[in-house]
From Swiss-Prot:
GO terms for biological process: L-proline biosynthetic process. This is Gamma-glutamyl phosphate reductase. PROSITE patterns: PROA. The keyword Signal does not apply. It comes from Prochlorococcus marinus (strain AS9601). It is found in: Cytoplasm. The gene is proA. Transmembrane segments: none annotated. HAMAP family: ProA (MF_00412). Gene3D superfamilies: Aldehyde Dehydrogenase, Chain A, domain 1 (3.40.605.10), Aldehyde Dehydrogenase, Chain A, domain 2 (3.40.309.10). Catalyzes the NADPH-dependent reduction of L-glutamate 5-phosphate into L-glutamate 5-semialdehyde and phosphate. The product spontaneously undergoes cyclization to form 1-pyrroline-5-carboxylate. It comes from the Bacteria.
Length: 436
Protein backbone atom coordinates (compact mmCIF):
# COMPACT_ATOMS: atom_id res chain seq x y z
CA UNK A 1 0.00 0.00 0.00
CA UNK A 2 2.73 2.44 0.94
CA UNK A 3 4.30 1.90 -2.46
CA UNK A 4 1.09 3.01 -4.19
CA UNK A 5 -0.04 5.86 -1.95
CA UNK A 6 2.08 8.19 0.12
CA UNK A 7 0.96 11.01 2.41
CA UNK A 8 3.23 14.00 1.81
CA UNK A 9 3.13 17.18 3.84
CA UNK A 10 1.12 19.93 2.10
CA UNK A 11 3.15 22.52 0.23
CA UNK A 12 2.66 26.27 0.47
CA UNK A 13 0.46 26.37 -2.63
CA UNK A 14 -1.93 23.76 -1.22
CA UNK A 15 -1.97 25.46 2.19
CA UNK A 16 -2.89 28.74 0.52
CA UNK A 17 -5.72 27.10 -1.43
CA UNK A 18 -7.00 25.37 1.69
CA UNK A 19 -6.98 28.61 3.66
CA UNK A 20 -8.94 30.37 0.92
CA UNK A 21 -11.57 27.63 1.00
CA UNK A 22 -11.72 27.80 4.80
CA UNK A 23 -12.26 31.57 4.76
CA UNK A 24 -14.88 31.26 2.02
CA UNK A 25 -16.67 28.54 3.98
CA UNK A 26 -16.90 30.84 7.01
CA UNK A 27 -18.51 33.51 4.82
CA UNK A 28 -20.96 31.07 3.25
CA UNK A 29 -21.89 29.59 6.63
CA UNK A 30 -23.23 33.02 7.59
CA UNK A 31 -25.14 33.47 4.31
CA UNK A 32 -28.92 33.63 4.36
CA UNK A 33 -30.89 30.75 2.85
CA UNK A 34 -32.14 32.77 -0.13
CA UNK A 35 -28.60 33.81 -1.04
CA UNK A 36 -27.41 30.20 -1.12
CA UNK A 37 -30.37 29.31 -3.34
CA UNK A 38 -29.50 32.26 -5.58
CA UNK A 39 -25.93 30.99 -5.81
CA UNK A 40 -27.11 27.54 -6.94
CA UNK A 41 -29.23 29.05 -9.70
CA UNK A 42 -26.27 31.11 -10.91
CA UNK A 43 -24.07 28.00 -10.79
CA UNK A 44 -26.60 26.15 -12.96
CA UNK A 45 -26.82 29.10 -15.36
CA UNK A 46 -23.07 29.18 -15.85
CA UNK A 47 -22.93 25.42 -16.37
CA UNK A 48 -25.45 25.88 -19.18
CA UNK A 49 -23.46 28.77 -20.67
CA UNK A 50 -20.32 26.64 -20.68
CA UNK A 51 -21.93 23.34 -21.68
CA UNK A 52 -20.17 23.07 -25.05
CA UNK A 53 -16.77 23.67 -23.44
CA UNK A 54 -17.56 21.07 -20.78
CA UNK A 55 -18.64 18.45 -23.33
CA UNK A 56 -15.60 19.16 -25.53
CA UNK A 57 -13.34 18.69 -22.51
CA UNK A 58 -15.08 15.42 -21.69
CA UNK A 59 -14.67 14.14 -25.24
CA UNK A 60 -10.94 14.84 -24.98
CA UNK A 61 -10.73 13.07 -21.61
CA UNK A 62 -12.71 10.09 -22.91
CA UNK A 63 -10.59 9.74 -26.04
CA UNK A 64 -7.40 9.88 -23.99
CA UNK A 65 -8.75 7.31 -21.51
CA UNK A 66 -9.66 4.92 -24.33
CA UNK A 67 -6.13 5.13 -25.72
CA UNK A 68 -4.74 4.35 -22.27
CA UNK A 69 -6.88 1.21 -22.05
CA UNK A 70 -8.89 2.26 -19.00
CA UNK A 71 -11.47 -0.32 -17.91
CA UNK A 72 -14.99 -0.35 -19.30
CA UNK A 73 -16.42 0.42 -15.86
CA UNK A 74 -14.31 3.58 -15.49
CA UNK A 75 -15.04 4.64 -19.07
CA UNK A 76 -18.75 4.34 -18.34
CA UNK A 77 -18.40 6.61 -15.32
CA UNK A 78 -16.18 9.06 -17.18
CA UNK A 79 -18.52 9.65 -20.14
CA UNK A 80 -20.57 12.82 -19.77
CA UNK A 81 -23.30 12.91 -22.40
CA UNK A 82 -25.38 15.98 -23.17
CA UNK A 83 -28.29 14.27 -21.43
CA UNK A 84 -26.24 13.50 -18.32
CA UNK A 85 -24.89 17.05 -18.22
CA UNK A 86 -28.37 18.54 -18.50
CA UNK A 87 -29.57 16.19 -15.78
CA UNK A 88 -26.69 17.32 -13.57
CA UNK A 89 -27.50 20.98 -14.18
CA UNK A 90 -31.14 20.38 -13.32
CA UNK A 91 -29.96 18.56 -10.22
CA UNK A 92 -28.07 21.69 -9.11
CA UNK A 93 -31.28 23.72 -9.36
CA UNK A 94 -33.31 21.07 -7.53
CA UNK A 95 -30.92 21.14 -4.58
CA UNK A 96 -32.04 24.74 -4.16
CA UNK A 97 -35.63 23.52 -3.82
CA UNK A 98 -34.76 21.39 -0.81
CA UNK A 99 -35.42 22.57 2.72
CA UNK A 100 -32.62 24.61 4.27
CA UNK A 101 -30.55 22.22 6.42
CA UNK A 102 -28.88 25.08 8.30
CA UNK A 103 -30.21 26.81 11.45
CA UNK A 104 -32.82 24.14 12.06
CA UNK A 105 -33.80 24.10 15.73
CA UNK A 106 -33.66 20.52 17.04
CA UNK A 107 -34.09 21.28 20.74
CA UNK A 108 -35.64 24.34 22.37
CA UNK A 109 -35.84 24.07 26.13
CA UNK A 110 -36.12 26.22 29.23
CA UNK A 111 -33.58 24.85 31.71
CA UNK A 112 -34.55 27.26 34.45
CA UNK A 113 -36.02 30.71 34.82
CA UNK A 114 -34.10 32.96 32.42
CA UNK A 115 -31.93 30.09 31.08
CA UNK A 116 -32.78 28.80 27.61
CA UNK A 117 -31.11 26.06 25.54
CA UNK A 118 -31.30 25.55 21.78
CA UNK A 119 -29.62 22.95 19.61
CA UNK A 120 -29.34 24.14 16.02
CA UNK A 121 -27.84 22.69 12.85
CA UNK A 122 -24.71 24.37 11.50
CA UNK A 123 -22.44 23.70 8.49
CA UNK A 124 -19.56 21.27 8.99
CA UNK A 125 -17.03 23.70 7.47
CA UNK A 126 -14.80 22.42 4.66
CA UNK A 127 -15.35 19.10 2.89
CA UNK A 128 -12.49 17.28 1.21
CA UNK A 129 -13.90 14.99 -1.48
CA UNK A 130 -11.75 12.50 -3.40
CA UNK A 131 -13.48 10.61 -6.20
CA UNK A 132 -12.76 8.65 -9.38
CA UNK A 133 -13.86 9.31 -12.94
CA UNK A 134 -17.42 10.60 -12.58
CA UNK A 135 -17.37 14.30 -13.57
CA UNK A 136 -21.11 14.64 -12.84
CA UNK A 137 -20.18 14.08 -9.19
CA UNK A 138 -18.52 17.53 -9.23
CA UNK A 139 -21.92 19.16 -9.81
CA UNK A 140 -23.65 17.03 -7.17
CA UNK A 141 -21.05 17.54 -4.48
CA UNK A 142 -20.55 21.26 -5.10
CA UNK A 143 -24.27 22.02 -5.06
CA UNK A 144 -24.78 20.10 -1.82
CA UNK A 145 -21.79 21.81 -0.23
CA UNK A 146 -23.01 25.32 -1.07
CA UNK A 147 -26.63 24.54 -0.13
CA UNK A 148 -25.48 23.35 3.30
CA UNK A 149 -23.18 26.34 3.82
CA UNK A 150 -19.89 24.46 3.40
CA UNK A 151 -16.77 24.94 1.33
CA UNK A 152 -15.36 22.03 -0.66
CA UNK A 153 -11.98 20.86 -1.96
CA UNK A 154 -12.40 18.40 -4.82
CA UNK A 155 -9.96 15.88 -6.25
CA UNK A 156 -11.22 13.81 -9.16
CA UNK A 157 -9.51 11.08 -11.11
CA UNK A 158 -6.74 12.30 -13.42
CA UNK A 159 -8.60 10.78 -16.37
CA UNK A 160 -11.30 13.48 -15.91
CA UNK A 161 -9.04 16.48 -15.26
CA UNK A 162 -10.12 18.48 -18.31
CA UNK A 163 -13.82 17.89 -17.66
CA UNK A 164 -13.59 18.61 -13.95
CA UNK A 165 -11.61 21.79 -14.58
CA UNK A 166 -14.24 23.06 -17.03
CA UNK A 167 -17.09 22.26 -14.64
CA UNK A 168 -15.42 23.88 -11.61
CA UNK A 169 -14.58 26.97 -13.67
CA UNK A 170 -18.28 27.36 -14.53
CA UNK A 171 -19.35 26.74 -10.92
CA UNK A 172 -16.87 29.32 -9.62
CA UNK A 173 -18.08 31.87 -12.17
CA UNK A 174 -21.64 31.25 -11.00
CA UNK A 175 -20.67 31.70 -7.35
CA UNK A 176 -18.86 34.92 -8.14
CA UNK A 177 -21.79 36.28 -10.17
CA UNK A 178 -24.12 35.56 -7.26
CA UNK A 179 -21.98 37.62 -4.91
CA UNK A 180 -20.38 34.75 -3.00
CA UNK A 181 -16.69 33.89 -2.76
CA UNK A 182 -15.73 31.63 -5.66
CA UNK A 183 -12.98 30.08 -3.51
CA UNK A 184 -15.64 28.06 -1.68
CA UNK A 185 -15.16 25.49 -4.47
CA UNK A 186 -11.60 24.37 -5.19
CA UNK A 187 -10.32 21.69 -7.57
CA UNK A 188 -7.04 19.86 -7.04
CA UNK A 189 -5.54 18.06 -10.04
CA UNK A 190 -2.45 16.25 -8.78
CA UNK A 191 -2.24 12.95 -6.91
CA UNK A 192 0.31 14.51 -4.55
CA UNK A 193 -2.19 17.18 -3.50
CA UNK A 194 -4.97 14.64 -3.04
CA UNK A 195 -2.80 12.68 -0.63
CA UNK A 196 -1.50 15.82 1.10
CA UNK A 197 -5.14 16.73 1.80
CA UNK A 198 -5.05 14.05 4.47
CA UNK A 199 -2.70 16.27 6.50
CA UNK A 200 -4.95 19.34 6.31
CA UNK A 201 -6.77 18.71 9.58
CA UNK A 202 -6.52 22.43 10.43
CA UNK A 203 -8.47 23.31 7.28
CA UNK A 204 -10.66 20.33 6.31
CA UNK A 205 -13.41 19.10 8.64
CA UNK A 206 -14.57 15.97 6.79
CA UNK A 207 -13.02 13.73 4.13
CA UNK A 208 -15.40 11.97 1.74
CA UNK A 209 -13.63 9.39 -0.44
CA UNK A 210 -15.48 7.96 -3.43
CA UNK A 211 -13.16 5.50 -5.08
CA UNK A 212 -11.59 2.07 -4.98
CA UNK A 213 -11.66 -0.14 -1.92
CA UNK A 214 -7.89 0.23 -1.65
CA UNK A 215 -8.00 4.03 -1.76
CA UNK A 216 -10.82 4.38 0.77
CA UNK A 217 -9.19 2.05 3.29
CA UNK A 218 -5.88 3.85 2.90
CA UNK A 219 -7.53 7.22 3.58
CA UNK A 220 -9.35 5.87 6.62
CA UNK A 221 -6.06 4.63 8.05
CA UNK A 222 -3.90 7.67 7.23
CA UNK A 223 -5.69 10.83 8.33
CA UNK A 224 -6.74 12.48 11.55
CA UNK A 225 -9.68 14.06 9.73
CA UNK A 226 -13.05 12.27 10.15
CA UNK A 227 -13.85 10.11 7.10
CA UNK A 228 -17.30 9.42 5.67
CA UNK A 229 -17.59 6.75 3.04
CA UNK A 230 -17.69 3.13 2.03
CA UNK A 231 -14.91 0.90 0.82
CA UNK A 232 -16.99 -1.60 -1.18
CA UNK A 233 -20.37 -1.98 -2.79
CA UNK A 234 -20.84 -5.74 -2.58
CA UNK A 235 -24.62 -5.95 -2.78
CA UNK A 236 -26.70 -9.15 -2.69
CA UNK A 237 -30.16 -10.17 -3.85
CA UNK A 238 -31.78 -13.30 -2.38
CA UNK A 239 -34.52 -15.04 -4.38
CA UNK A 240 -36.67 -16.87 -1.83
CA UNK A 241 -38.67 -20.06 -2.49
CA UNK A 242 -41.85 -17.97 -2.28
CA UNK A 243 -40.71 -15.35 -4.76
CA UNK A 244 -42.83 -14.27 -7.72
CA UNK A 245 -40.71 -15.64 -10.56
CA UNK A 246 -41.36 -12.87 -13.08
CA UNK A 247 -40.71 -10.22 -10.43
CA UNK A 248 -37.51 -11.97 -9.39
CA UNK A 249 -36.22 -12.03 -12.97
CA UNK A 250 -37.08 -8.38 -13.57
CA UNK A 251 -35.60 -7.10 -10.30
CA UNK A 252 -32.45 -9.22 -10.58
CA UNK A 253 -31.83 -8.00 -14.13
CA UNK A 254 -32.38 -4.34 -13.22
CA UNK A 255 -30.21 -4.65 -10.12
CA UNK A 256 -27.32 -5.86 -12.28
CA UNK A 257 -27.52 -4.29 -15.73
CA UNK A 258 -29.30 -0.93 -15.27
CA UNK A 259 -25.89 0.57 -14.42
CA UNK A 260 -23.36 -2.16 -13.55
CA UNK A 261 -20.61 0.34 -12.67
CA UNK A 262 -22.68 1.71 -9.78
CA UNK A 263 -21.90 0.72 -6.20
CA UNK A 264 -25.56 -0.25 -5.65
CA UNK A 265 -25.61 -2.83 -8.45
CA UNK A 266 -25.70 -6.42 -7.20
CA UNK A 267 -22.56 -8.54 -7.38
CA UNK A 268 -24.02 -11.77 -5.96
CA UNK A 269 -27.37 -13.44 -6.56
CA UNK A 270 -28.47 -15.99 -3.94
CA UNK A 271 -31.09 -18.55 -4.97
CA UNK A 272 -33.19 -20.82 -2.76
CA UNK A 273 -32.48 -24.37 -3.91
CA UNK A 274 -36.14 -25.11 -4.65
CA UNK A 275 -36.61 -22.15 -7.00
CA UNK A 276 -33.13 -22.24 -8.54
CA UNK A 277 -33.85 -24.71 -11.41
CA UNK A 278 -36.91 -22.82 -12.67
CA UNK A 279 -35.30 -19.43 -12.13
CA UNK A 280 -32.02 -20.28 -13.87
CA UNK A 281 -33.82 -21.85 -16.83
CA UNK A 282 -35.19 -18.40 -17.64
CA UNK A 283 -32.44 -16.25 -16.13
CA UNK A 284 -29.43 -17.72 -17.95
CA UNK A 285 -30.60 -16.82 -21.48
CA UNK A 286 -31.93 -13.48 -20.18
CA UNK A 287 -28.61 -12.47 -18.66
CA UNK A 288 -26.70 -13.86 -21.65
CA UNK A 289 -28.72 -11.69 -24.04
CA UNK A 290 -27.65 -8.69 -21.95
CA UNK A 291 -23.96 -9.68 -22.09
CA UNK A 292 -23.75 -10.61 -18.40
CA UNK A 293 -21.09 -13.18 -17.52
CA UNK A 294 -22.46 -15.58 -14.90
CA UNK A 295 -20.14 -17.23 -12.38
CA UNK A 296 -21.61 -19.79 -9.99
CA UNK A 297 -21.05 -22.35 -7.27
CA UNK A 298 -21.05 -26.05 -8.15
CA UNK A 299 -24.82 -26.44 -7.82
CA UNK A 300 -25.55 -23.54 -10.15
CA UNK A 301 -22.97 -24.80 -12.66
CA UNK A 302 -24.84 -28.11 -12.68
CA UNK A 303 -27.96 -26.12 -13.60
CA UNK A 304 -26.32 -24.41 -16.57
CA UNK A 305 -24.15 -21.55 -15.28
CA UNK A 306 -21.03 -21.66 -17.47
CA UNK A 307 -18.21 -20.56 -15.14
CA UNK A 308 -17.40 -21.85 -11.67
CA UNK A 309 -16.87 -19.29 -8.91
CA UNK A 310 -13.92 -19.18 -6.53
CA UNK A 311 -14.01 -17.97 -2.92
CA UNK A 312 -12.58 -14.68 -4.18
CA UNK A 313 -15.69 -14.04 -6.28
CA UNK A 314 -17.94 -13.76 -3.22
CA UNK A 315 -15.91 -10.79 -1.98
CA UNK A 316 -15.34 -9.08 -5.32
CA UNK A 317 -16.99 -5.84 -6.43
CA UNK A 318 -17.00 -6.28 -10.21
CA UNK A 319 -18.58 -2.95 -11.23
CA UNK A 320 -19.11 -4.70 -14.55
CA UNK A 321 -21.44 -7.11 -16.35
CA UNK A 322 -20.37 -10.03 -14.16
CA UNK A 323 -22.62 -11.73 -11.61
CA UNK A 324 -21.83 -14.40 -9.02
CA UNK A 325 -24.58 -16.92 -8.28
CA UNK A 326 -24.87 -19.17 -5.24
CA UNK A 327 -27.61 -21.67 -4.41
CA UNK A 328 -28.53 -21.87 -0.73
CA UNK A 329 -30.66 -24.33 1.24
CA UNK A 330 -32.78 -21.77 3.06
CA UNK A 331 -33.12 -18.21 4.36
CA UNK A 332 -30.67 -18.85 7.18
CA UNK A 333 -27.90 -19.86 4.77
CA UNK A 334 -28.58 -16.78 2.64
CA UNK A 335 -28.35 -14.56 5.72
CA UNK A 336 -25.13 -16.28 6.82
CA UNK A 337 -23.55 -15.71 3.40
CA UNK A 338 -24.56 -12.04 3.34
CA UNK A 339 -23.33 -11.45 6.88
CA UNK A 340 -19.97 -12.90 5.87
CA UNK A 341 -19.45 -11.13 2.54
CA UNK A 342 -21.69 -8.05 2.46
CA UNK A 343 -20.07 -4.62 2.54
CA UNK A 344 -23.18 -3.39 4.41
CA UNK A 345 -24.21 -1.21 1.50
CA UNK A 346 -27.50 -2.60 0.18
CA UNK A 347 -28.95 -6.12 0.25
CA UNK A 348 -32.37 -7.28 -0.90
CA UNK A 349 -34.85 -10.14 -0.88
CA UNK A 350 -37.56 -11.19 -3.33
CA UNK A 351 -40.41 -13.03 -1.61
CA UNK A 352 -44.18 -12.98 -1.23
CA UNK A 353 -43.86 -14.10 2.38
CA UNK A 354 -43.94 -11.02 4.63
CA UNK A 355 -42.62 -12.94 7.65
CA UNK A 356 -39.58 -14.09 5.67
CA UNK A 357 -39.04 -10.58 4.33
CA UNK A 358 -39.26 -9.01 7.77
CA UNK A 359 -36.81 -11.49 9.25
CA UNK A 360 -34.34 -10.83 6.44
CA UNK A 361 -34.67 -7.06 6.74
CA UNK A 362 -34.36 -7.04 10.52
CA UNK A 363 -31.35 -9.36 10.67
CA UNK A 364 -29.25 -8.02 7.78
CA UNK A 365 -27.15 -5.13 9.10
CA UNK A 366 -26.75 -3.08 5.94
CA UNK A 367 -27.40 0.61 5.33
CA UNK A 368 -30.22 -0.42 2.98
CA UNK A 369 -32.36 -3.56 3.19
CA UNK A 370 -34.85 -3.92 0.34
CA UNK A 371 -37.91 -6.11 -0.25
CA UNK A 372 -39.23 -6.81 -3.76
CA UNK A 373 -37.39 -3.96 -5.46
CA UNK A 374 -34.11 -3.24 -7.22
CA UNK A 375 -31.00 -2.42 -5.21
CA UNK A 376 -30.44 0.42 -7.68
CA UNK A 377 -32.94 2.49 -5.66
CA UNK A 378 -30.20 3.00 -3.03
CA UNK A 379 -29.48 6.53 -4.15
CA UNK A 380 -29.89 9.99 -2.67
CA UNK A 381 -31.83 11.36 -5.64
CA UNK A 382 -34.20 8.38 -5.68
CA UNK A 383 -34.71 8.75 -1.92
CA UNK A 384 -35.79 12.34 -2.47
CA UNK A 385 -32.62 13.88 -1.02
CA UNK A 386 -32.08 15.89 -4.21
CA UNK A 387 -28.59 14.50 -4.69
CA UNK A 388 -25.98 12.72 -2.63
CA UNK A 389 -22.43 13.52 -1.69
CA UNK A 390 -21.68 9.85 -1.12
CA UNK A 391 -22.83 6.68 0.59
CA UNK A 392 -21.76 5.68 4.07
CA UNK A 393 -21.75 2.07 5.23
CA UNK A 394 -20.66 2.88 8.77
CA UNK A 395 -23.09 2.08 11.57
CA UNK A 396 -23.02 5.54 13.14
CA UNK A 397 -24.94 8.27 11.29
CA UNK A 398 -25.01 9.49 8.66
CA UNK A 399 -25.66 6.11 7.05
CA UNK A 400 -26.64 5.13 3.52
CA UNK A 401 -26.97 7.83 0.84
CA UNK A 402 -25.77 11.09 2.37
CA UNK A 403 -27.52 14.26 1.26
CA UNK A 404 -27.85 17.63 2.90
CA UNK A 405 -28.66 16.30 6.36
CA UNK A 406 -25.29 14.56 6.48
CA UNK A 407 -23.39 17.77 5.71
CA UNK A 408 -24.44 19.66 8.81
CA UNK A 409 -23.62 19.13 12.45
CA UNK A 410 -25.12 20.92 15.44
CA UNK A 411 -24.21 23.35 18.20
CA UNK A 412 -25.75 24.06 21.58
CA UNK A 413 -26.77 27.67 22.17
CA UNK A 414 -27.35 28.55 25.82
CA UNK A 415 -28.69 32.00 26.72
CA UNK A 416 -28.97 33.15 30.31
CA UNK A 417 -29.39 36.14 32.57
CA UNK A 418 -26.37 35.85 34.84
CA UNK A 419 -27.24 32.28 35.84
CA UNK A 420 -24.59 30.39 37.84
CA UNK A 421 -24.39 26.70 38.74
CA UNK A 422 -23.76 27.43 42.42
CA UNK A 423 -27.33 28.74 42.78
CA UNK A 424 -28.62 25.31 41.78
CA UNK A 425 -26.21 23.53 44.14
CA UNK A 426 -27.35 25.70 47.05
CA UNK A 427 -31.04 25.41 46.22
CA UNK A 428 -31.54 29.07 45.31
CA UNK A 429 -32.58 28.03 41.79
CA UNK A 430 -34.27 24.94 40.36
CA UNK A 431 -34.25 23.29 36.96
CA UNK A 432 -37.53 23.38 35.06
CA UNK A 433 -36.41 21.45 31.93
CA UNK A 434 -39.47 22.55 30.00
CA UNK A 435 -39.55 22.01 26.24
CA UNK A 436 -40.75 25.07 24.36
Amino acid sequence: MANIFEVPQPGNDLLEKANKVRLASIEISQTENQNRIKALNFMADYLEKNSYEILDANNADYSSAQKKGISRALLSRLKLSKLKLNSGIEGVRKVGDLADPVNQVQIKRELSKGLFLERKTVPIGVLGVIFESRPDAVMQISSLAIRSGNGVMLKGGSEANLTNTAIVKALQEGLNASGLDKNAICLLTSRKDSMAMLNLEKYINLIIPRGSNELVKFIQENTRIPVLGHADGICHLFIDIEANLEMALSVALDSKIQYPAACNAIETLLLHKDIAPTFLEKAIPLFKSNDVKLIGDMRSVELGVKYEASLEDWKTEYLDLILSIKIVDDLEEAITHIQKYSSKHTDGIITENSHTANKFMNVIDSAGVFHNCSTRFADGFRYGFGAEVGISTQTLPPRGPVGLEGLVTYKYFLKGDGNIVDDFSSGKAIYTHKDL
